[in-house]
Amino acid sequence: MRIAIEDLEVSLSGRTVVSGVHLVAAEGEIAGLVGPNGSGKSTVLRTVYRYLRPHAGRVLVGGADITSLTPAESARRVAALPQERGSDFELSVRAVVAMGRTPYKRAFAGEDRADAEIVAAALAGVGLAGAEKRRFSALSGGERQRVLLARALAQDPEVLVLDEPTNHLDVLHQVELLALLRAQRRTTLLSLHDLNAAASLCDRLHVLHGGSLVASGPPREVLTPELLAEVFGVRAAVVDHPLTGDPLIAFDHRTPAAGSPRAVAEEGAATAV
């Protein structure tokens, strides 16, 4: 199912935080939002899973304006892993994941065999097949993250919206998560701070800066040294990954990009001396 965000504008507390954003995620495509902190990534995602309502523009999912759908219709199309994640569920892991089946159930309807199989598959997919009876509130941050992803998968949506899905995960589970998302072949819109993970996972990247979209395209075309310097304020080389051939960003941690806050501060200090 295709996502289209058209001329999106979002205002919070009277301040425009996202303006004029237009992007598309084609059916089956993994589209990544990248940008510095405060660039508007989470705000854009929140309009897709209806946590925020646009001030102007619209979000189309499968050709329908997301705000025109009922909550159940929306939940059958879009499942989200937001940054606003509950951590105090006094429920078992399995019960939390089974919540993903709610959009398909009538009031007071019980779980059927198909539901049970979907929940089991979702737990297995995130490596938690043996954790069904554990209490969600007793889990580590990384384990909770994986349970909530399993809940989104159990929802069996057309579209996944994931806000920093690799947060709190160790390296092994990050790699497994990226492989799982690739294998899903499901339209996915996600934000990532790790630019190398974004370059490896995403079919297309959309770069946000100051609430505006400044670049879109395949990772190899978007993640240039010039853009990394201008948007992220870092000096870097982009090479081929020796194992996968994906773009690999090698950051220069010693020398700031010209014009970056660090470079300006160092230049000012040198001038003062």
Model regions: which residues?
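Conserved structural motif at the start of ABC-family nucleotide-binding domains
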Residues: 3-5, 18-20
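Conserved ABC transporter NBD signature motif
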Residues: 57-65, 74
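A short, proline-enriched helix->beta-strand linker immediately N-terminal to the Walker B motif
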Residues: 154-158
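ABC ATPase nucleotide-binding domains
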Residues: 229-273
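Catalytic Walker B motif of ABC-type/P-loop ATPase nucleotide-binding domains
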Residues: 160-164
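The feature captures the beta-strand-to-loop junction immediately N-terminal to the Walker
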Residues: 34-36
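Helix-to-loop junction immediately C-terminal to a conserved catalytic motif
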Residues: 49
